[in-house]
Amino acid sequence: MFFNKKKNDKQVVDWHTIDVKLVLTENAAVKKQIQMLGLTVEDLKHLKVFKPQVDENIDRIVDTFYNNLGMEQSLVDIINQHSSVDRLKVTLMRHICEMFSGVIDTEYFEKRKKISRVHVHIGLKTKWYIGAFQSLLIDFIQLVQDHIDDDDQRFRTIAAISKILNFEQQVVLEEYELVVERMQEQLEQQKRQIGNAVIESSSNLAAISEETN
């Protein structure tokens, strides 16, 4: 059990009983990102303790998320072209539950990278992605305010949620950057190929001109 009762019937968390996992030793860059965010095992514990409230309200959270996306027609078009709202709702529910599972490991990170590549592939602009995550953060903060009375635990839970959402966004934005870099490399390669073709064509013309003379 996560909770014990004090004499005044106030629920407090028995933190020692909460099992979480933060392991990313195979990826030094990701490990550095997590260190810079200050995302710790204690944060994962706060997320896991709060998961029952998230699970209880997950339908409303996801509905609000997609209602907000529905305000932008280009996003609706992207969704309808590549999937459906109902399918994506199931995916988002699973995604959110994993965020509050208390586990961040290589598998967690690889899943995020895969999702990021999908976002890039379907043409989801970064401004919409960031805006959508901001709406999630507001929803989570309101949920914390409604369910946690203790000031310190409330602050730590909100901080943990902010960190995990920031980490998720970093993974996606990094994938966008990689795509842009690859596109720039391809453009430079095309420029070189065109330049070489022009030089070769000029050389051939010069050779033909000399033969004619």
Question: How would you describe each model-predicted region?
Answer:
Residues 148-176:
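Preference for long, well-ordered alpha-helical segments
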Residues 45-49, 120, 149, 189:
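Short coil/turn segments at secondary-structure junctions
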Residues 27-38, 47-48, 54-141:
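Heme-based O2/NO sensor domains and their adjacent alpha-helical segments
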Residues 43, 47, 154, 191-194, ...:
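Disorder-to-helix initiation segments
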Residues 59, 63, 134, 138, ...:
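Generic detection of well-ordered alpha-helical segments
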Residues 170-213:
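Long cytosolic alpha-helical coiled-coil signaling stalks of chemosensory transducers
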Residues 1-45:
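Charged, compositionally biased N-terminal leader segments and the immediate start
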